[in-house]
Amino acid sequence: MKPRLSTVPTVAWIMLLALLAAWLLTWSPTAAAADQVVDLLARSRALQRAQQAVLGVQAVAVEDARSARTLGKARSGSGVLIGADGLVLTIGYLVLEAEAVALVHGDGRLVPARVLGYDVATGFGLLQALTPLGLEPAPLGRSGAVVAEQPLMIASGGGDGAVSVAQLVSRRDFAGYWEYHIEAALFTAPPRRDHSGAGLFNSAGELVGIGSLLVADAAGSVEGRTDGVGGGAGQRPQRSGNLFVPVDLLTPILAELRARGFSAASRRAWLGLNCAVLDGRIRVLRVSDDSPADVAGLVAGDGILRIDGTEVHAVDQLWKTLWAGGAPEREISLEIERDNLVQTLKVFSVDRMKTLKRAKGI
């Protein structure tokens, strides 16, 4: 069946043309004019295909889902068609513990889908459309090849989907306060609020990232920092933007995600902590109810000094030490500071994948 081409809204075409105009500025003045025109037409078609491959995503979490407390029960965002068989890549938190998922065309039509995979380690979510979408999939590019200030396209999907031009502001490791860490995250500007699951494309229409967060400091306040802490020498002006999970993290695990629903790296220890560095020390921001940390007696405000005897000063160091320390389910020693007193707590970690609820039959 020949893929159906949806109508691109006028505003979207304006943004696509702006992207092409920005790319034109990078051309070599010695290139042949005819070759430039052919290249421009090819890129225009590729960008149109990329925009049409972005769909809306609507999900409803299962009853009593732990994630509903922070993400809500009903969620919406975007996803990108990456396979001719209806395979859609999105950001995992949209479909975490979901019992019902639908894909949304630009004209509002709904297509039922199921969750094929959720990868804790990268944050990716994988969906399978249950009926034909009639669209061309977007090819995967190389996120590592994206260079600073290169014009990029951000596209969200669904009835209110939009297209805009962005630039790569920085590429660096990112540690999330919720026991999450990825390498070489892509930070872009200007910011988009409809970032969840949105596609980040290069000028060839190749997918290079999936939208995850709105961030206050896309440039990185201090070069090389991965804990999100600013201040001190070398500080750069803050610039709001978005964080995209690079598709280079998907390529090595895609077959595994399709076969098992998660990568081997997702079977790791989980404590149920939200942490950040405050005043030079790792502090507990929140403890998930009934989590290992909650059972062990940790509370918001506790300072974490050591984990299994290893001194930690940054959030990424804390998470990586936790995951590298042994089996997902084990006894962990946390040295903490509370009310100016140092004490040691024993925490029995659990396998993160075992804590997630699934719809019946999945």
Regions found by a protein language model. Give the residues of each.
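Conserved active-site neighborhood of the chymotrypsin/trypsin-like protease fold
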Residues: 62-64, 76, 83-163, 185, ...
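PDZ-domain C-terminal substructure recognizer with occasional recognition of PDZ-binding tails
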Residues: 114, 256-262, 290, 296-299, ...
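Bacterial N-terminal signal peptides
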Residues: 14-27
